[in-house]
Amino acid sequence: MENKKTIYFLCTGNSCRSQMAEAWGKQYLGDKWNVYSAGMEAHGVNPNAIKAMNEVNIDITNQTSDIIDANILNSADLVVTLCSHADSVCPSTPPHVNRVHWGFDDPAGKEWSEFQRVRDEIGERIKRFSKTGE
């Protein structure tokens, strides 16, 4: 099915939140959406993000940490910024690209429970979007 829409999850380092969002997006939206993630910088996938997603039986070890790709950004049907930094510093998007902000705390460098909490919050938010389109 090539008529898929494209959703692009952005955060600062494409290390934690956007990686989890990409994985949840593929799980909940993969049949209707092409799901990508990127960051203002590429910090590498955080090992705790991998561990947190493994806890819910989602393997993100093969996901890569990428800098924002202008081609994907310019052709995306929906761009979702996941942290205040990416929302304020995100490259300008063309008028036809729908851009929304879903703020989540950055778990990097915090206690393990923060990774679990943020993982679950992102999962619930994307699950809601998959059902309601909001």
Swiss-Prot record:
Keyword Oxidoreductase: yes
Main subcellular location: cytoplasm
Keywords for the protein's UniProt record, in alphabetical order: Arsenical resistance, Cytoplasm, Disulfide bond, Oxidoreductase, Redox-active center
Gene Ontology MF: a single term: arsenate reductase (thioredoxin) activity
One Gene Ontology biological process: response to arsenic-containing substance
Pfam short name (any one): LMWPc
Catalysed reactions listed for this entry: arsenate + [thioredoxin]-dithiol + H(+) = arsenite + [thioredoxin]-disulfide + H2O
E.C. number: 1.20.4.4
UniProt superkingdom: Bacteria
Annotated S-S bridges: C11-C83, C83-C90
Cell location: Cytoplasm
Gene Ontology CC entries for this record: cytoplasm
Catalytic center residues: C11 (nucleophile), C83 (nucleophile), C90 (nucleophile)
InterPro entries linked to this entry: Arsenate_reductase_ArsC, Ptyr_pPase, Ptyr_pPase_sf
Function: Catalyzes the reduction of arsenate [As(V)] to arsenite [As(III)].
UniProt record similarity statement: Belongs to the low molecular weight phosphotyrosine protein phosphatase family. Thioredoxin-coupled ArsC subfamily.
Protein name, per record: Arsenate reductase
Organism of derivation: Bacillus cereus (strain ATCC 14579 / DSM 31 / CCUG 7414 / JCM 2152 / NBRC 15305 / NCIMB 9373 / NCTC 2599 / NRRL B-3711)
Gene: arsC
